[in-house]
Swiss-Prot record:
This is Acetyl-coenzyme A synthetase. Keywords: ATP-binding, Ligase, Nucleotide-binding. It comes from Emericella nidulans (strain FGSC A4 / ATCC 38163 / CBS 112.46 / NRRL 194 / M139) (Aspergillus nidulans). ATP binds at G404, E405, P406, D428, T429, Y430, W431, Q432, T433, D519, R534, R545. The gene is facA. The keyword Hydrolase does not apply. Its EC number is 6.2.1.1. One of its GO terms (biological process) is acetyl-CoA biosynthetic process. CoA binds at R211, G212, G213, K214, T329, S542, R603. Induction: By acetate. Belongs to the ATP-dependent AMP-binding enzyme family. One of its GO terms (molecular function) is AMP binding. The keyword Transmembrane does not apply. Pfam families: ACAS_N, AMP-binding, AMP-binding_C. InterPro entries: Ac_CoA_lig, ACAS_N, AMP-bd_C, AMP-bd_C_sf, AMP-binding_CS, AMP-dep_synth/lig_dom, ANL_N_sf.
């Protein structure tokens, strides 16, 4: 006899794991493979992963010696801890990044193609061999040295996607200088802030850039930004279009004229494993961009390891990452991973829609690309454009990667079926500027995948799901919380340039003894990870992390604005879109021109990619009695969740919520 009604089964916490199929590695992946993946199967991954967590010092020492060439070997694998924020890897070792990326391949096979340059206009590109790359890198290194750049100095790079960007990276690292790349879509103000923060005395740029058929006045932007940077003594200018540009005698020098003065070889300077390799500025929740600092050996090892095992790179491969060198994706997977592993890397100057929506597929077919890595934003755009643009076989493609944000299941399936012809393995990767390389990801040829999930942790990565309320780790499967990591790994950022306390407070002091990602995540019933997105005040637009505080600061600079609040909401094309709420100072009236001016203000202050998609002018913002703006309420209103705003009685003026809802409805024509 029953003891009473049987309780209904408890719904799954990570419900989407039960709504998708699991995809095994396509048989065609192995059929078209020249030699087979680096790992035999999932069991081999599990065995190596277990070793990387239980015996990290043994594991990483072996892999470092296997994948990198050290001038002086190390005795210690790792010192320091997450708790103290003083982690260091291979501390006695010495090496050079440029040697590891160029010389060792140039010595073995100087005629092998290192860079496949796909220019903005189709058929205007060129290839550069490893031998040629060594000569070009050496000459630019000489130029930098003659202009007074010493080991440890920072060099700002403001270049579009041209081979000279890679050459500039490697020329800096060849002489032990620290490259600080500023995305060539950033405004003159953003460039100025980054040059000043890094203390760069040399800036490398072009006369102009070309992208999607449009010309970008890079030198003009640099000149404007440097008006308030008196310490910059050299601007090295590569002639991309031949346009006439303003010139400051004594400071500005032409790349093509300078490189002719110097020899085609300069010996690489040996640096310590922990010497800085580069700074990369990322948006922080406080608004002030932070210069994330990566060091040499650990970062290079992370790039080489993930290139080898995630993307299954072999030295005859032709690897195409669609990311820009102004972001971490371009650093790690356009430049360092492919060149460390000695394959050919595609440098793509254009856009996926220029001159038409078949551009990516044309490039893949033309260059017999074997691995392709791009953001879901581009995939959504191309899916929407229609499958008739995909008219190539692209039969060499083995791996299709996704980066920057979670990829929706329907886009994943389209990528697999239409682009990969059900023959390529999809790798939906999760990582950050601060992690340096992929941290949760499938391994090509090895990991069964689920559309929408980043799959399983990479070697050395021990994820923890943390309860944000109690701060305690949640064990077991089918759980959700915030994502943290329990162990250090070689490619993690070491500090924020000139602000170690900020580094500690952002990543290591939130949950003591853990690295805090700032992202929410679920671990499903089979241990697969599903990334939920930011839990702090950062908006992810087209894979670019933007600080809401930084955008708010730009809006408040406008003389009419009293207060501003910025939130990110879901957007079909860009993943998230920036929406801004502003209240105006007394005496100012709302009109369309004000909204246009505010969007322009953000474009000028930060860059076009940060511009709000919508600006709502309201009489006040929802604030607590202590004055804190409740962005959560604004997010819910924009998402149509007005019936689940929660308790608004704690607001200093609860009636403001109804007025904001009315403004949003009126703007949307409801």
């Amino acid at each position: 006899m029953s003891d009473g009604p049987i309780a209904p089964p408890k719904p799954a916490v990570v419900a989407e794991a039960h709504e998708v199929d699991t995809f095994h590695v396509p048989k065609a992946f192995f059929d078209k493979h020249p030699s087979g993946p680096h790992l035999k199967n999932l069991d081999e991954y599990k065995k190596l992963y277990e070793e990387s967590i239980r015996s990290p010092d043994v594991f990483w020492a072996r892999k470092a010696r296997e994948l990198l060439t050290f001038d002086k070997d190390f005795q210690t694998t790792r010192i320091g801890s997450l708790e103290n924020g003083d982690v260091a890897w291979f501390p006695e070792g010495r090496l050079n990044a440029s040697f590891n990326c160029v010389d060792r391949h140039a010595i073995k096979n100087p005629n092998k193609v290192a860079i496949i340059y796909e220019a903005d206009e189709p058929n205007e590109g060129r290839t550069i061999t490893y031998g040629e790359l060594l000569r070009e890198v050496s000459r630019v290194a000489w130029v930098l040295k003659q202009r007074g750049v010493k080991k440890g100095d920072t060099v700002a790079i403001y270049l579009p996607m041209i081979p000279e960007a890679i050459i500039a990276f490697l020329a800096c690292s060849r002489i032990g200088a620290v490259h600080s790349v500023v995305f060539a879509g950033f405004s003159s103000d953003s460039l100025r802030d980054r040059v000043l923060d890094a203390g760069s005395k040399v800036v490398i740029t072009t006369d102009e850039g070309k992208r999607g058929g449009k010309v970008i006045g890079t030198k003009r932007i640099v000149d404007e930004g440097l008006k308030q940077c008196p310490d910059v003594s050299t601007v090295l200018v590569y002639k991309r279009t031949g346009a006439e540009v303003p010139w400051t005698e004594g400071r500005d020098i032409w790349w093509h004229e300078e490189v002719e003065k110097y020899p085609a070889y300069i010996a690489p300077d040996s640096v310590n494993s922990e010497d800085p390799l580069f700074l990369l500025y990322t948006s922080g929740s406080t608004g002030k961009p932070k210069g994330v600092m990566h060091t040499t050996a650990g970062y290079l090892l992370g790039a080489a390891m993930t290139g080898k095992y995630v993307f299954d790179i072999h030295d005859d491969d032709r690897y195409f990452c669609g990311g820009d060198v102004g972001w971490i994706t371009g650093h790690t997977y356009v430049v360092y991973a492919p060149l460390l592993l000695g394959c050919s890397t595609v440098v793509f100057e254009s856009t996926p829609a220029y001159p038409d929506f078949s551009r990516y597929w044309d490039v893949i077919e033309k260059h017999k690309v074997t691995q392709f890595y791009v953001a879901p934003t581009a995939l959504r755009l191309l899916k929407r454009a229609g499958d008739h643009h995909i008219h190539h076989k692209m039969e060499h493609l083995r791996v299709l990667g996704s980066v920057g944000e979670p990829i929706a299941a329907e886009v994943w399936k389209w990528y697999f079926e239409k682009v990969g012809k059900e023959e390529a393995h999809i790798c939906d990767t999760y990582w950050q500027t601060e992690t340096g390389s992929n941290v949760i990801t499938p391994l090509a040829g090895v990991t069964p995948t689920k559309p929408g999930s980043a799959s399983l942790p990479f070697f050395g990565i021990e994820p923890a799901i943390i309860d944000p309320v109690s701060g305690e780790e949640i064990s077991g499967n089918d759980v959700e919380g915030v994502l943290a990591f329990k162990q250090p790994w070689p490619s993690m950022a070491r500090t924020v340039w000139g602000a170690h306390k900020r580094y500690m407070d952002t990543y290591l002091n939130v949950y003591k003894g853990y690295y805090f990602t700032g992202d929410g995540a679920g671990r499903d019933h089979e241990g697969y990870y599903w990334i939920r997105g930011r839990v702090d005040d950062v908006v992810n637009v087209s894979g670019h992390r933007l600080s809401t505080a930084e955008i708010e600061a730009a809006l408040i600079e406008h003389p009419m604005v009293a207060e501003a609040a910025v939130v990110g909401i879901a957007d079909e094309l860009t993943g998230q879109a920036v929406n801004a709420f502003v209240s105006l100072k007394e005496g100012n009236e709302t009109n369309d021109q004000v909204r246009k001016d505010l969007i322009l203000q953000v474009r000028k202050s930060i860059g076009p990619f940060a511009a709000p998609k919508a600006v709502f002018v309201v009489d006040d913002l929802p604030k607590t009695r202590s004055g804190k703006i409740m962005r959560r309420i604004l997010r819910k209103i924009l998402s149509g969740e007005e019936d689940s705003l929660g308790d608004i009685s704690t607001l200093s003026d609860p009636s403001v919520v109804e007025r904001i809802i009315a403004t949003v409805h009126a703007s949307r024509g409801k």
